[in-house]
Regions:
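Residue-level detector of anion-binding/catalytic polar loops
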Residues: 1, 67, 176
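N-terminal positively charged helical leader segments and presequences
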Residues: 1-33
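Fold-independent oxyanion-binding glycine-rich loops
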Residues: 7, 48, 115, 134-137, ...
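Short connector loops at helix/strand junctions that flank enzyme active sites
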Residues: 11, 21-23, 37-41, 149-151
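RNA substrate-binding interface of SAM-dependent RNA methyltransferases
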Residues: 29, 33-132
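Active-site/ligand-binding-proximal alpha/beta "capping" segment
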Residues: 125-168, 175-178
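Structured adenosyl-cofactor binding patch, chiefly the S-adenosyl-L-methionine
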Residues: 164-206
Length: 206
């Protein structure tokens, strides 16, 4: 028997009936299982990092329970793709999401937003709920914040972080700057540390 999921929250038990060169035919058996998603609805706004680092962020963010990942071109992003190359990369990230769901037992695929520039996203998204900016020089730690409700956005920069202009735009849009301790973290470490801490404080890690 194998387990199959539809990406929308449902998992089935199945048995393999036929194996062909290009397909496998399964017979669905057993009860339908609806798996619970995390109670904390997190959207990760991730400044696009270099290939292997971005893959790691996407993979681990899924395991840590994000509901949505929004890739953003930022001033310090070291890779800028267009056209077919961007489409190929987006399909690759979608594959990383599917593989991560298979590994961690999630039956609902997190959304992968259409890649856009940071400024375009800021101008086109006003219904965000509480928003947090990972900012090493902030004086505010997560422990000082009140529980924000069940829907939040987390903004993490690429290698080198956000530029001064990008930080100013985030703060003017209502983002709250937070630090993750006294050490400067790599982009992949910062995003994942923030997600784990938020799930511990406000989500299903507790």
């Amino acid at each position: 028997p194998v387990s199959v999921f539809d990406g929308k929250g449902c998992e089935h038990r199945a048995t393999v009936k036929t194996i062909k060169r290009s397909e496998i035919i399964l017979e669905i058996a057993g009860a339908l299982t609806v798996l619970q998603e995390p109670s904390l609805d997190i959207t990760l706004l991730q400044g696009i990092a270099r290939n292997d680092r971005m893959d790691l962020i996407v993979q681990k963010a899924v395991e840590l329970g994000v509901n949505s990942i929004q890739p953003l071109w930022m001033q310090r992003s070291q890779t800028h793709l267009k056209g077919s190359r961007l489409e190929k990369r987006s399909k690759h990230w979608q594959g990383v999401i599917i593989s991560a769901c298979e590994q961690c037992g999630r039956a609902t695929l997190p959304d992968l937003g259409t890649t856009m520039t940071y400024s375009d996203w800021m101008l086109s998204n006003n219904d965000r709920g509480p928003c947090f900016l990972l900012q090493p020089d902030s004086k505010t730690g997560l422990g000082a914040l009140q529980p924000p409700g069940n829907r939040i956005h987390v903004l993490a920069g690429p290698e080198g972080g956000l530029s001064d202009d990008e930080q100013m735009l985030a703060r003017s849009a209502g983002f709250i700057g937070i630090h993750l301790g006294p050490r400067i973290l790599r982009t992949e470490t910062a995003a994942l540390a923030a997600l784990a801490a938020m799930q511990t404080l406000w989500g299903d890690f507790n």
